[in-house]
Amino acid sequence: MDERLILEAGRVKDGLRVLVTGGGSGIGASVVDALRSAGAKVFVCDIDPSTSPDHVADISQGQQVEEMFRAIERDLGGLDVLVNNVGIAGPAGLVDEIDPNDFDEVLRVNLSGTFRVTACAVPLLRTADSGLIVNIASTAGIFPYPYRSPYVAAKWAIVGLGRSWAMELGEDNIRVNVICPGSVGGPRMDQVIQKEAQAKGVGEAEIRSGYETQVSMRRFMDAADVAGAVVYMASPAGRHVSGQVLSVDGATESLRSS
């Protein structure tokens, strides 16, 4: 056993060049902080300029994505790791209550945006010593969530993309994994609960309790829990981990299926 791999599970190669989309807040910001603490050089993309990203971009717009990658090549000189984190929650409601335009927006950002970014990143990752793509999906990409069908559709697709890319890109020494977070506490989850409560005509406390009881630990996760999984995958200890869908969810999946 190479004990160095165990010791290095929380460290990455010094100067590892990483792009994190949606890195200005929430899970993305936690991933950025963790990777920087682990020794990486991180380029942050976000649509919100108030979060002070390295580059402001809407990843659903092809020209903006191309401009972002020109900035990455200028600032980093290449790329070793891509973390596809951008995602919007979208609407909540029954299928006949959701505006098709809102459905399209969720797919345009969460799915097409991820595809655009990855298509631009892969040529750079091929020139790295060892490339890595991490798709941040959701437990909504593993099993259904009523009233959240646009988001569920996008996240199931993100999981499928990740598993397919792992098979496509292995010969190029590019690993691809998917992380499926459970319910992460914070403003984003508060908005989800509010929308779902309105759609169902019940109180927010009831919705919140429902989410919490789906977790074996009976509490929401912290974004740092997801960030730790990303660091592991980017570390030497994760060098042969590819094609995996990792649930970081407090056993939400097993409780829902029991």
Annotated model-derived regions:
Residues G170, R175, V241-G243:
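Short, small/polar-rich loop/turn modules that mediate ligand/substrate recognition or access, typified
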Residues D2-E3, V178, G186, V202-A237, ...:
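C-terminal helical subdomain
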Residues D2-V12, A89-A92, F143, R219, ...:
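Short C-terminal tail/terminal secondary-structure segment
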Residues S138:
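Residue(s) in the substrate-gating loop at a strand-loop-helix junction
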Residues A57-E67, P100:
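The beta1-alpha1 cofactor-binding region of Rossmann-like NAD(H)/NADP(H)-dependent oxidoreductases
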Residues T118, A154, G162:
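Active-site helix of classical SDR
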Residues G93-V95, D99-L107, Y211:
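Substrate-binding pocket helix/loop in short-chain dehydrogenase/reductase
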